[in-house]
């Protein structure tokens, strides 16, 4: 306000005519000065709303002029404390409402809204459907998770960008407020030469940035609310509730909301400093006003106005009053210091007197409590004697009471003690017996384990010997290159097997198998599988040549050879599993059937079919039949021994 008066007086002073050129110039200068003053008052009223309200209250009709010249009064900006933080919904199915600032009352703005807008019924917002709970068309859970992940990523990006923009806007607002505070301080300290135009510019800039950061904050709050809504919807889905982005999104939303709240508190703190500066300027103005009133009270005829030229005599008068006032204040300060020092000295003296009085009283009490040395010794001796007598009587009484109580206790609880002792002995006896039984079981188990280990070792050795026996029956002596050389005797391996079983006396099954095995197999060995296949093919080839020989001579052999050479071998239509009718079969068809059975792996059936041949074919196949049957018997016995060894190993495992 003082700046506006300075501006008005300066303009009035500059508009005065340097000379007295006439009444017209004086009237023009007066009108210009009034116009400039009115413009200055209007300009400052546009800056300071309080000054405008005071002006409208003092000067009637000024409100219409001000509304016409500088426009209607702007509505008050929403305060920072009216902003509310982000609201979270307690029900996860209901998304939180987007953030909206508290509406400003329309009466303050002075604008009448349309009645249609106020009477319009509010539309009831429908709750958004959750796309992650269920749908009419079934979706793949993987597709729902991917859709939720993509949506959360987009919302996270938007929320972070909006929060960053809002934070930057808040920082700019803080800088503008600090600049406004600094310009106010500089203008106040400059006094008459203060630049209040820069204060106005700084105020308008801070106001514009505050409105801008409010919009940015609203957008950021809405973006964070959308992020929380999407995370809540995803957390309700059966297949999307375990998505790792759901808790991350909620934590990020809370972090961004806290960041916005922190920036709002920073803005409030800086704005509070601006309010303090405004109070400081008011105090300075109040002090100057009081000083002016003092001057008017002392010198009523003194013309003291801002911007007016002061006479030298008046200036000396003002300086003299100021020096007098300073001397008075200095004298008052000195008197206050002296009074304070006197008060402190009186308090110290009173405290000292209190301490001395207390010390004197304590000394008197100690002197009154002193007992002569002789009386003290006599009193101590009498007191010790009386105490000893009392202690002796008390000890005797206590011993008697304890003795009586012990006798009563022994009589009452003797039976209970005996029963408790007997019960404890029985418990200890049962516990010791149980422990001894467990110990005996452990010893028996350990001895049994030793025997089982021996049996298990023997069973493994028997299994290895049986495997060697089976391999010898199937493959023979692999080092030999001739058929007879590959026949490996089985007698030594049977002796090894019997020794593994304890000499054959402890295992009757092995002993029976050893007895059932052919002596030829033990001494000479058996033909291998490959050798039997070779002999079978040779027997079939020779048997076909003599298939038509019964008991004739050489001509019959020649005839059979020619006939078999000219005979076309036909594969029978019957399967290999079909039964045979010996009456309708001949040697030729029997050999063909035997070959089919041998190739299909049914060697026992092939041997039986060869036994149905007759004549020279039977004589040719007789040795082969005996060797093949003996080899199959040895193979069967080795398999039985192998199964017996496996069973023995299982039984000996613990």
Curated annotation (Swiss-Prot):
Q: Which residues lie on this side of the membrane: Mitochondrial intermembrane?
A: 44-654
Q: Give residue spans, biased composition: Basic and acidic residues.
A: 115-129
Give GO BP annotations, semicolon-separated. cristae formation; mitochondrion organization; response to reactive oxygen species
Instruction: Alphabetically list the UniProt keywords.
Output: Cytoplasm, Membrane, Mitochondrion, Mitochondrion inner membrane, Transit peptide, Transmembrane, Transmembrane helix
Q: Which interval of the chain is the signal sequence?
A: none
Tissue specificity, in the record's words, reads:
Expressed in the gonads and muscle cells.
Q: Please name the InterPro entries in this protein's record.
A: MIC60
Role, per record: Sustains mitochondrial morphology probably through maintaining cristae morphology. May act as a component of the MICOS complex, a large protein complex of the mitochondria.
Q: What is this protein called?
A: MICOS complex subunit MIC60-2
Please report the organism this UniProt entry assigns to the protein.
Answer: Caenorhabditis elegans
- Name of the gene: immt-2
């Amino acid at each position: 306000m003082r700046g506006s008066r300075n501006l008005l007086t300066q303009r009035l002073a500059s508009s005065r005519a340097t000379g007295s050129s006439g009444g017209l110039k004086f009237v023009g200068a007066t009108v210009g000065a009034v116009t400039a003053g009115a413009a200055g008052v209007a300009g400052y009223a546009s800056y300071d709303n309080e000054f405008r309200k005071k002006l409208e209250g003092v000067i009637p009709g000024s409100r219409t002029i001000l509304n016409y010249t500088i426009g209607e009064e702007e509505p008050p900006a929403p305060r920072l404390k009216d902003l509310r933080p982000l609201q979270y919904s307690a029900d996860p199915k209901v998304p939180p409402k987007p953030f909206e600032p508290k509406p400003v009352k329309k009466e303050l703005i002075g604008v009448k809204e349309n009645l249609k807008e106020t009477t319009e019924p509010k539309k009831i917002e429908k709750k958004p459907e959750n796309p992650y709970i269920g749908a009419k068309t079934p979706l793949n859970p993987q597709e729902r998770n991917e859709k939720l992940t993509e949506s959360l990523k987009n919302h996270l990006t938007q929320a972070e960008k909006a929060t960053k923009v809002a934070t930057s806007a808040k920082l700019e607002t803080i800088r503008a407020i600090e600049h406004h505070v600094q310009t106010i301080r500089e203008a106040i300290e400059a006094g008459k030469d203060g630049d209040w135009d820069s204060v106005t510019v700084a105020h308008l800039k801070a106001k514009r940035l505050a409105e801008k950061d409010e919009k940015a904050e609203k957008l950021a709050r809405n973006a964070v609310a959308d992020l929380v809504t999407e995370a809540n919807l995803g957390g309700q889905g059966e297949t999307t509730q375990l998505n790792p982005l759901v808790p991350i999104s909620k934590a990020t939303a809370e972090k961004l909301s806290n960041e916005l709240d922190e920036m709002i508190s920073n803005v409030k703190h800086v704005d509070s400093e601006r309010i303090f500066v405004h109070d400081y300027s008011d105090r300075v103005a109040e002090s100057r006003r009081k000083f002016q009133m003092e001057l008017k009270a002392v010198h009523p005829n003194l013309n003291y106005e801002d911007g007016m030229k002061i006479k030298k005599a008046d200036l000396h008068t003002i300086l003299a009053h100021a020096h007098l006032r300073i001397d008075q204040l200095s004298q008052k300060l000195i008197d206050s210091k002296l009074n304070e020092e006197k008060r402190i000295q009186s308090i110290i003296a009173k405290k000292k007197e209190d301490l001395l009085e207390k010390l004197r009283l304590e000394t008197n009490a100690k002197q009154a409590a002193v007992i002569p040395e002789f009386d003290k010794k006599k009193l101590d001796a009498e007191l010790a004697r009386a105490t000893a007598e009392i202690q002796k009587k008390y000890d005797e009484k206590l011993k008697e009471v304890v003795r009586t109580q012990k006798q009563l206790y022994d009589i009452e609880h003797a039976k209970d003690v005996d029963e408790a002792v007997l019960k404890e002995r029985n418990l200890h006896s049962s516990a010791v017996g149980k422990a001894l039984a467990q110990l005996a079981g452990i010893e028996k188990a350990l001895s049994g384990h030793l025997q089982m280990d021996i049996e298990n070792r023997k069973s493994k050795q028997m299994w290895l010997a049986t495997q060697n026996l089976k391999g010898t029956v199937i493959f023979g002596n692999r080092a030999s290159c001739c058929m007879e050389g590959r026949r490996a005797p089985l007698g030594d391996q049977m002796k090894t097997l019997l020794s593994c079983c304890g000499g054959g006396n402890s295992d009757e099954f092995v002993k029976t198998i050893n007895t059932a095995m052919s002596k030829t197999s033990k001494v000479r060995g058996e033909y291998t599988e490959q050798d039997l296949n070779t002999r079978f093919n040779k027997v079939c080839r020779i048997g076909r040549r003599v298939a038509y020989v019964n008991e004739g001579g050489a001509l019959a052999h020649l005839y059979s050879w020619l006939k078999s050479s000219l005979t076309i071998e036909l594969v029978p239509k019957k399967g290999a599993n079909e039964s045979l009718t010996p009456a309708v079969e001949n040697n030729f068809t029997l050999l063909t059937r035997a070959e089919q059975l041998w190739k299909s792996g049914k060697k026992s059936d092939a041997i039986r079919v060869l036994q149905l041949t007759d004549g020279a074919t039977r004589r040719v196949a007789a040795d082969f039949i005996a060797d093949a049957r003996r080899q199959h018997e040895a193979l069967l016995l080795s398999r039985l021994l192998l199964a017996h060894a496996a069973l023995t190993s299982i039984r000996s495992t613990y």
